[in-house]
Each structure stands twice: as structure tokens, then as C-alpha cells.
Amino acid sequence: SLRRRQRQMCIRDSSSVGGKTGVNLPEGKNLVGTFKQPAYVCASTAVLATLDDREWACGCAEIAKASVIDSDEFFFWMMDHASALEARDPVVVTEAIARSVVFKANVVAEDKTESRGVRECLNYGHTLGHAVEALAGYGTFSHGAAVAEGMRFAARLGVDVVGTSAELVDAQDELLDALGLPALAWSAPAEEMLAAMKRDKKTRAGEVRFVLPRDIGDWELVAVPDEVILEHLRRWEDSKSL
């Protein structure tokens, strides 16, 4: 039987309870993998003290993602405790991980093999995030930093596509900043980013799909037309030159 002992923040609060493995290929991230539920997961917070700031922030990104998708209560708890989490307060860290793991475990229990659409919400921020990782070169940015950038992009895309409020965009930016996840000072040409997105495993029939937040705790999976994606990618690219 499979047993997992988690030593990394990102794994502990996210992939440890996903029951999924993935291998990165030159063409894209996690393009080969399988589903296998562990017999149990051991998550000791004591070893988190060994993580550097980059890996710590990486895990915080996945917790922030969970809070946006889950509920007002989780999100505003994160807003209230972001500074303490970034400072590694042990009580806050334990609570944040517990909330994130419960959220993901509940989602996975409903859709263990990504066949019902429920689990798609866990890809929030990952469509642009995976493209950033692939084009910048794996390891250039942490997975969490790339996902945080993808969350910023998806929220702004959501304003035009599903009516996401400007208040949500600003609140999410504030949370990510407080967790040590500033906007990346990096970009790639819009056409290259779109091509990388089309190689992502979430693409269907050539259509790039985004998880977009209508509101905190309310999301929609949308196949966004290429021209709309390119328009927003050009805005994103231009914002890096300011």
C-alpha cells in the first residue's frame, strides 16, 4: 500500500490528498501520470521549519487558491491571518493546512479521477501558471509563484468573461502580496503563452479552459476564445514593462 510522509508545504496542503502523480515533459507540465490513493498521509508541521522562504511561499499559494475557491469564511480567515502565516506562526500554520486539506479532500472525494468536473476547481491559477513554468524553464519560478501569477491573471480575465468584481481582484492581490507572492517581473509573448496553454492537459479539442471566480467560493470552468485570451495576455505582457 502507498504511504506518504509530506515534508514540503505545497505537497502537505495540496497534492498529499489528491491521489494523483504527474511527470513533467518538455511539452508541458504533468502530461503523464496516474491516480493512486495513499493508505494514509502523515503531515508533521515540525519539518516545515526546514523550508526556505521560496518553498514556504509556494505552499501558501496553494492555500490561498483553496480559500478563493472554497468560501468567504476561509478567504477572510486567510486575509486576517496572512501576516501570521507568512511569519510561520505555528498555530496559524496548523489551522491553515487543516482547512486546506479538508477542502481538497472533500473535492477529491466527489471526483477522484477528474471525471465529473468537480475537481476542475483545483486547477484555479494553473492554466497560466503551467505555461509560465514551461516557458520560463522548470525551476526558474516555484510552482506556487507561477500559480499565484495564474490566479492574478484568471481573476482579471474573469472580470470580462464571468463578471468577477474588481473588489475580488484587489482582495486577492492583497492576500497574495501579504503571503510573499508578489506579481512576477517576467513575461513571454502572448502567442507563445497561448501555444503553451494549448499543450496543457486541461485543454479540450483545442480550447483553453480556465477556472474563473465569479465570486469567492463561486467558480466556473470556461472555454475562453483564443482572441479573448490573447487580448488579456497582451495586457499582462504590457503590465510587466511598466
Predicted regions and their residues:
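Single conserved hydrophobic/aromatic residue that forms the stacking wall/gate
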Residues: 1-11
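Short coil/turn connectors at secondary-structure junctions
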Residues: 5, 36-38, 207
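Active-site-proximal loop->helix
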Residues: 12-33, 174-175
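Structural motif
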Residues: 22, 30, 39-41, 145-146, ...
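Carboxylate- and glycine-rich phosphate/diphosphate-binding segment that chelates Mg2+/Mn2+
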Residues: 29, 36-121
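C-terminal charged capping/lid subdomain of soluble metabolic enzymes
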Residues: 61-63, 163-242
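Active-site segments that bind and position negatively charged phosphate/pyrophosphate groups
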Residues: 81-191
